[in-house]
Design a protein with these regions (language model features):
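ATP-binding N-lobe of GHMP and related small-molecule kinases
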Residues: 1-91, 109, 113-115
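Gly/Ser-rich oxyanion-binding loop with an adjacent helix/lid
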Residues: 76-140
Protein backbone atom coordinates (compact mmCIF):
# COMPACT_ATOMS: atom_id res chain seq x y z
CA UNK A 1 0.00 0.00 0.00
CA UNK A 2 1.31 3.42 -0.94
CA UNK A 3 -0.29 6.76 -0.10
CA UNK A 4 0.27 10.31 -1.34
CA UNK A 5 -1.27 13.68 -0.57
CA UNK A 6 -1.28 16.18 -3.44
CA UNK A 7 -2.35 19.80 -3.91
CA UNK A 8 -3.36 21.48 -7.18
CA UNK A 9 -4.01 25.22 -7.09
CA UNK A 10 -6.97 27.15 -8.37
CA UNK A 11 -6.12 29.19 -11.43
CA UNK A 12 -7.21 32.34 -13.20
CA UNK A 13 -6.58 32.48 -16.95
CA UNK A 14 -8.47 35.40 -18.43
CA UNK A 15 -6.26 38.29 -17.36
CA UNK A 16 -7.01 41.50 -19.22
CA UNK A 17 -5.64 41.72 -22.73
CA UNK A 18 -3.76 38.43 -22.24
CA UNK A 19 -6.98 36.40 -22.45
CA UNK A 20 -5.90 32.72 -22.22
CA UNK A 21 -2.23 33.48 -22.85
CA UNK A 22 -1.55 34.79 -19.34
CA UNK A 23 -2.69 33.19 -16.13
CA UNK A 24 -1.82 32.66 -12.52
CA UNK A 25 -2.16 30.04 -9.82
CA UNK A 26 -3.46 30.85 -6.35
CA UNK A 27 -1.36 29.87 -3.33
CA UNK A 28 -3.88 28.52 -0.85
CA UNK A 29 -7.02 27.89 -2.87
CA UNK A 30 -7.11 24.52 -4.59
CA UNK A 31 -7.82 20.84 -4.36
CA UNK A 32 -6.16 18.45 -1.94
CA UNK A 33 -6.42 14.74 -2.68
CA UNK A 34 -5.18 11.83 -0.61
CA UNK A 35 -4.65 8.86 -2.89
CA UNK A 36 -3.90 5.28 -1.87
CA UNK A 37 -2.94 2.42 -4.17
CA UNK A 38 -3.56 -1.16 -3.10
CA UNK A 39 -3.73 -4.53 -4.84
CA UNK A 40 -6.83 -5.32 -6.83
CA UNK A 41 -8.75 -3.08 -9.18
CA UNK A 42 -11.32 -0.33 -8.99
CA UNK A 43 -11.70 3.24 -7.89
CA UNK A 44 -13.35 4.70 -4.81
CA UNK A 45 -13.79 8.43 -4.25
CA UNK A 46 -14.74 9.79 -0.83
CA UNK A 47 -15.69 13.42 -0.39
CA UNK A 48 -14.62 14.84 3.00
CA UNK A 49 -15.60 18.40 2.07
CA UNK A 50 -18.83 20.39 2.16
CA UNK A 51 -18.59 20.93 -1.60
CA UNK A 52 -21.12 18.82 -3.52
CA UNK A 53 -19.49 16.30 -5.88
CA UNK A 54 -21.04 13.69 -8.18
CA UNK A 55 -22.07 10.56 -6.29
CA UNK A 56 -21.44 8.35 -9.33
CA UNK A 57 -17.68 8.03 -9.91
CA UNK A 58 -18.36 7.93 -13.67
CA UNK A 59 -19.36 11.60 -13.40
CA UNK A 60 -16.26 12.65 -11.45
CA UNK A 61 -13.31 14.06 -13.43
CA UNK A 62 -10.86 12.06 -11.31
CA UNK A 63 -12.06 8.72 -12.71
CA UNK A 64 -11.03 9.12 -16.38
CA UNK A 65 -7.65 10.49 -15.29
CA UNK A 66 -6.93 7.34 -13.27
CA UNK A 67 -8.12 5.10 -16.10
CA UNK A 68 -5.96 6.92 -18.66
CA UNK A 69 -2.93 6.56 -16.39
CA UNK A 70 -3.45 2.80 -16.18
CA UNK A 71 -4.01 2.61 -19.95
CA UNK A 72 -0.81 4.54 -20.71
CA UNK A 73 1.40 2.68 -18.24
CA UNK A 74 -0.02 -0.84 -18.31
CA UNK A 75 -0.08 -0.75 -14.51
CA UNK A 76 -3.04 -1.64 -12.30
CA UNK A 77 -4.36 -1.40 -8.77
CA UNK A 78 -7.24 -0.28 -6.62
CA UNK A 79 -7.18 3.48 -6.10
CA UNK A 80 -8.86 5.09 -3.12
CA UNK A 81 -9.20 8.87 -3.41
CA UNK A 82 -10.18 11.10 -0.50
CA UNK A 83 -11.08 14.65 -1.50
CA UNK A 84 -9.87 16.72 1.48
CA UNK A 85 -10.22 20.22 0.03
CA UNK A 86 -12.19 21.18 -3.09
CA UNK A 87 -12.71 24.25 -5.25
CA UNK A 88 -16.42 24.84 -5.67
CA UNK A 89 -17.49 23.63 -9.16
CA UNK A 90 -18.57 26.41 -11.48
CA UNK A 91 -16.63 29.06 -9.57
CA UNK A 92 -14.53 29.94 -12.60
CA UNK A 93 -11.18 29.24 -10.98
CA UNK A 94 -10.40 25.85 -12.44
CA UNK A 95 -12.21 23.35 -10.23
CA UNK A 96 -12.17 20.52 -12.80
CA UNK A 97 -8.63 21.39 -13.90
CA UNK A 98 -7.35 21.24 -10.32
CA UNK A 99 -8.97 17.86 -9.67
CA UNK A 100 -7.68 16.49 -12.97
CA UNK A 101 -4.14 17.79 -12.43
CA UNK A 102 -4.02 16.56 -8.84
CA UNK A 103 -5.23 13.10 -9.87
CA UNK A 104 -2.67 12.83 -12.69
CA UNK A 105 0.21 14.01 -10.50
CA UNK A 106 -0.92 11.82 -7.59
CA UNK A 107 -1.11 8.71 -9.77
CA UNK A 108 2.36 9.37 -11.11
CA UNK A 109 3.71 9.74 -7.57
CA UNK A 110 1.92 6.59 -6.37
CA UNK A 111 3.56 4.54 -9.09
CA UNK A 112 7.09 6.01 -8.85
CA UNK A 113 6.82 8.54 -11.68
CA UNK A 114 6.64 6.49 -14.91
CA UNK A 115 5.12 9.38 -16.90
CA UNK A 116 6.72 12.56 -18.23
CA UNK A 117 5.11 15.94 -17.58
CA UNK A 118 3.59 15.88 -21.08
CA UNK A 119 2.13 12.42 -20.48
CA UNK A 120 0.62 13.60 -17.19
CA UNK A 121 -1.05 16.44 -19.11
CA UNK A 122 -2.57 13.85 -21.46
CA UNK A 123 -4.00 12.03 -18.43
CA UNK A 124 -5.33 15.25 -16.89
CA UNK A 125 -6.98 16.20 -20.20
CA UNK A 126 -9.24 13.16 -19.82
CA UNK A 127 -10.84 14.80 -16.79
CA UNK A 128 -11.22 18.07 -18.67
CA UNK A 129 -12.84 16.19 -21.56
CA UNK A 130 -15.48 14.91 -19.15
CA UNK A 131 -16.03 18.34 -17.60
CA UNK A 132 -16.36 20.13 -20.93
CA UNK A 133 -18.38 17.47 -22.70
CA UNK A 134 -15.88 17.33 -25.55
CA UNK A 135 -12.35 16.39 -26.44
CA UNK A 136 -9.48 18.87 -26.46
CA UNK A 137 -7.40 18.30 -29.58
CA UNK A 138 -4.09 19.65 -30.76
CA UNK A 139 -2.79 20.79 -27.38
CA UNK A 140 0.22 18.46 -27.37
Amino acid sequence: MKKVRVFAPASIANLGCGFDVMGLALDEVGDILEMTATEGSGITITNKTDVPLPEDIEDNVITPVIRKFFEMTGLSGHIDVVVCQKIYPGSGIGSSAASSAAAAYGMNELYDCPLTDEQMVICAMEGENLASGGEYRGLL
